[in-house]
Amino acid sequence: MTNSGDEEITPASLKATRKGERVSIGSLLPPSELVRSGESTEHIRVLAETDEDLPPIVVHRGTRRVVDGMHRLWAARFRGDESIEVVFVDGSPADVFVLAVELNRAHGLPLTLDERKSAAAQIMDSHPHWSDRKIARTTGLAASTVASLRSSSTAGTVGRRTGQDGRSRPNDGTDGRQRAAALLARNPNASLREVTRAAGISVGTASDVRARLRRGEPALTARQQAVMKLRPAAAQRSGPDYGRVLENLRKDPSLRFTDLGRRLLRLLDGSVPGSVEQIAQIADGVPEHCRTVVVDMARECAAAWQHLADQLADRDTA
């Protein structure tokens, strides 16, 4: 995450930045991913009435979306200001979200426990290689809480995770053991060093896999076999939580306080997709004499939503 001068952006470096560049308020957009579940009217009023110079807000250069400082932006609008001080940052959407979480924790209103858990879940999806402790430090949660969230998460698993010190370490070793077993099945005479290098595991793990296979046992430990049995079930539950997404959209002031925004929310409210099971139940319940009409209406609705999606996607890439 860098600024226009290719300097590394951190909460500490931004805290020391008291001067940005003046930007038109009308050119800025709210975050695409909300860290905070809603705005505090009282906090906006306090900021609007303060005589102190507030720190510049942080904005992602590529999208013009606010990374940190929505309350300051709302306060500026409340005062009738036409522009606001901005510090621009560059980076991927995933890294921008992490920075937003760090900045929200560093100053301003504290995030609630649910907000921090939601942030941790999203970081697990975008940074699955991060260790529990690294995510815990970023979100202000206990490492045990992050571990619990990860165990129930639908995010994919990775062979290695990056800790707070930046070093990469093996995860549970399941994938590495499977690679080692496959290699030894093809070449039983492979040396431990060859297995270690090809499978990305330690010499001790490679030795244990070879010993297990020679005894006729599975390459995975009992605990790892139990984890593997749970993976297919987790995969079936994967997919966006549209209920949570819609709840965040309902709290976005740019939608809540405009006629077109409220119209969009009403449309979305009646269009949030259900689970596969729920859709199957609805399909089973449609009377035979209504099926043709329902099919036509469903396809028309799908086409209309696809048209809207295409228009929005075109604007993002313009």
Curated annotation (Swiss-Prot):
Coiled coil: none annotated. SMART domains: ParB (SM00470). It comes from the Bacteria. Residues 146-176 are annotated as: Disordered. Disruption phenotype: Cells produce only 2% of the novobiocin. GO terms for biological process: antibiotic biosynthetic process. Keywords: Activator, Antibiotic biosynthesis, DNA-binding, Transcription, Transcription regulation. GO terms for molecular function: DNA binding. Residues 162-176 have a biased composition (Basic and acidic residues). Residues 146-156 have a biased composition (Polar residues). Transcription regulator that specifically activates expression of genes involved in the novobiocin biosynthesis pathway. Binds 5'-GTTCRACTG(N)(11)CRGTYGAAC-3' DNA sequence. Belongs to the ParB family. This is Transcriptional regulator NovG. It comes from Streptomyces niveus (Streptomyces spheroides). The lineage of its organism: Bacteria, Bacillati, Actinomycetota, Actinomycetes, Kitasatosporales.
